[in-house]
Each structure stands twice: as C-alpha cells, then as structure tokens.
Amino acid sequence: MSTAIVVFSGGQDSTTCLIQALTQYDHVHCITFDYGQRHNQEIEVAKKVSIELGAASHKVMDVGLLNELAVSSLTRDNIPVSHELQENGLPNSFVPGRNILFLTLAGIYAYQLGAEAVITGVCETDFSGYPDCRDEFVKSINQSLVLGMDRQLEIKTPLMWLNKAETWALADKYGKLDYVRNHTLTCYNGVIGDGCGDCPSCDLRKNGLDAYLENKEPVMADLESKL
C-alpha cells in the first residue's frame, strides 16, 4: 500500500497537489503548520478542504517558534504586504526558514507513518523570489533527510516546472478547477476564492487563471507534455 504526505495550506497549489496525490497513492495524509501566519484562517480552510477531498488524515502542527524567529509581512500584522522587493532582493512576504522547517517536519512525519513520499506545491517557474522554493533547495533537503534518517524518502514537487496557467490546467484535468477556484485560500489578506485582487498572491493566481481560460487547449497541451 502506497502512502504520501502532502504539505497542505489549503491554497491553490497544495490543494492541486492533494487532488493529484489522491489518484496516485492508496493513503494520502495532510500536514498543516500553524506558525501564526497572517491569514490564520488558512488552517480552518485546510481542515475543511482535506476532509471534503478525502484525505486519510489531517494533522495540524504548532510551530509558533518560527513566528518568533522569522520577521515577515506574513508573520507580522504591522508589516503590510508589499509588491516591491526589499534591499536584499526578496519580497517582504518571504518567511526565512519556513520550507526548511516544514519539509524537515513533514519528513519526520513520513518516517512515523511509513510514507515513501512528501509532496509540496513549491514552484520555480512563476518564481516569487523565495529561495526555499527552488528545485536545488528541495533536492538538497531531500538528500539530508535520507542521510539523517537512514531511510528512503522522496520529496515530490509536481508543480515545480509548471506556470500558474498550467497549475490551473492540472486542477481542470482532474475535474476540480471550480472547486479549487471557489474553496481555496491563496490571498495574503485572507479572502477565500478569488481573493482580494490586490496582493501579489492574488495577482499571480488571477493572471494564471485568465491565461488558462483564454487558451485552454494549448495550455493543457503544454501541461500534458510536462507530466
């Protein structure tokens, strides 16, 4: 029996990963991290979506220490989300160490459950400027987990080389485009569905959806060539 862990936020990307994983594994478990994020309601959305889609279980893990250490517009209500890059070249929504911590803990959880894969929705194509979303980072931490736990584990990144339009196409391929559009939370300001329409995350999501809806056949063909 095959088992996978999905690092799950209840957003577009992780929900699309969950939808796909449910067709590929016998048991799919979700893990969500509570780090005092700006839109904390994502935890409730993640619980609801994981149940509705049929995950075997959903674990919420308290990692509040990350909030104390990582100063970001996603961990501090008094720091507005900015469209401009900081002096270091990163967006102010970058949470230092977030995916290092998340993937490490998900790997430990996979060890506990005997899962062979951890699935995460990070993506390098529509690069948001987050260094911990890069393919080389994921491969590096994957190797460290295998060495550190002396057990085979694969961190899978099904969206890594997809653009946002192709991610929408992937949801549509499984008949879940409307579900993802209406029930997921990607917005930095906590607005479910199409979002606030103003934050960088909403811009990326909307532009991708528009690109897919305007060019369904070629986008789907591009997606199929990458699967």
UniProtKB/Swiss-Prot annotation:
Binding site for Zn(2+): 187, 196, 199, 202
Record-listed E.C. numbers: 6.3.4.20
NCBIfam families: 7-cyano-7-deazaguanine synthase QueC, PRK11106.1
Purpose of the protein: Catalyzes the ATP-dependent conversion of 7-carboxy-7-deazaguanine (CDG) to 7-cyano-7-deazaguanine (preQ(0)).
Catalytic activity: 7-carboxy-7-deazaguanine + NH4(+) + ATP = 7-cyano-7-deazaguanine + ADP + phosphate + H2O + H(+)
Protein name: 7-cyano-7-deazaguanine synthase
Pathway membership: Purine metabolism; 7-cyano-7-deazaguanine biosynthesis
Gene designation per UniProt: queC
Named cofactor requirement(s): Zn(2+)
Protein family: Belongs to the QueC family.
Binding sites annotated in the UniProt record for ATP: 8-18
Annotated source species: Aliivibrio fischeri (strain ATCC 700601 / ES114)
